[in-house]
Amino acid sequence: MITVTINNKKYEANEGEYALQVLKREGIEIPYLCYHEALSPYGACRLCMVEVTGGARPGITTSCTLVVTDGLEIQTEAPEVVRIRKVLLEMYLAEAPGSEAIQELARKFGVERSRFADFDIEAKGDRCVLCGRCVRVCNEVLGVGAINYASRGTKSNINTPWYGVSSACIGCTACAYVCPAGAIDIIDSGDERIMETWNRTTLKLKECVETKEFFATEKVIDHVYSKALDLPEDLKEVSAGSRMRRRASEFLPKYLRK
Ligand code: SF4
């Protein structure tokens, strides 16, 4: 274990972890968008900036990419850090005027309005802040790579290749799950899952043989079975709830006999 000082108070930390992980563990509030515990550090949104006041490299840096070392001293509320954070939040408000999650985050850190756009809380505009979590989860975690950054500058966006229906997307919904801005729309309708945001890429859903509920896309099931060895074939046909009930009915009698 090593010792780091955050806002003049000492904390224990594990060698090699990132400062943002320590901040989160210790309940020290700091905003972030591109960080997610399932993904590698990215340092893109810049919101998790802290000031390093003691240690090898003093200055302002992103805590999600700052590896803690023994004796590191950081301040999360230094005046310059707070100033940069507020300007960034104003920019995100302007970039994603339709995202309630971003409005809430900005409000939490003292920003109600943006100087960079006519900010209207009722606006239903763009919700994406280009943090890239969806791109990275699709690539890094699933190994699918159905979406990526497209275009440049003010036209930057995240999309499927050629802005069309994706043949790669498996409809797992991980992208929507990790999106901090609520920018990805998915509609389940009957036996279909429609990835609205990904140009209405449509996937067939599988029906549970026991409950008759539609529970996952056929492509997701194939993907899982292609990665995991020795999964019983019959589990392909049943929802998570039915799987749990099956396991409970297999194991509970043994325990109840004890
Ligand atoms: S739903 Fe499609 S785009 Fe989203 S993470 Fe899964 S495979 Fe990638």
What is the predicted role of each segment?
Residues V22-G59, K86-E90, A117-D126:
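Immediate flanking context of iron-sulfur cluster ligation sites
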Residues R57-A168, D185-V238:
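Fe-S ferredoxin-like electron-transfer domains
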Residues V238-R257:
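Short metal-binding segments enriched for Cys and/or His
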Residues Y35-A38, M49-V52, T65-V68, G132-L142, ...:
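Cys/His-coordinated zinc-binding microdomains
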Residues I6-K9:
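Short strand-turn-strand beta-turns centered on an Asx-Gly dipeptide
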Residues E17-Q21, V67:
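Short, structural beta-strand-to-alpha-helix junction motif
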Residues M1-T3:
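Extreme N-terminal starter segment of soluble prokaryotic enzymes
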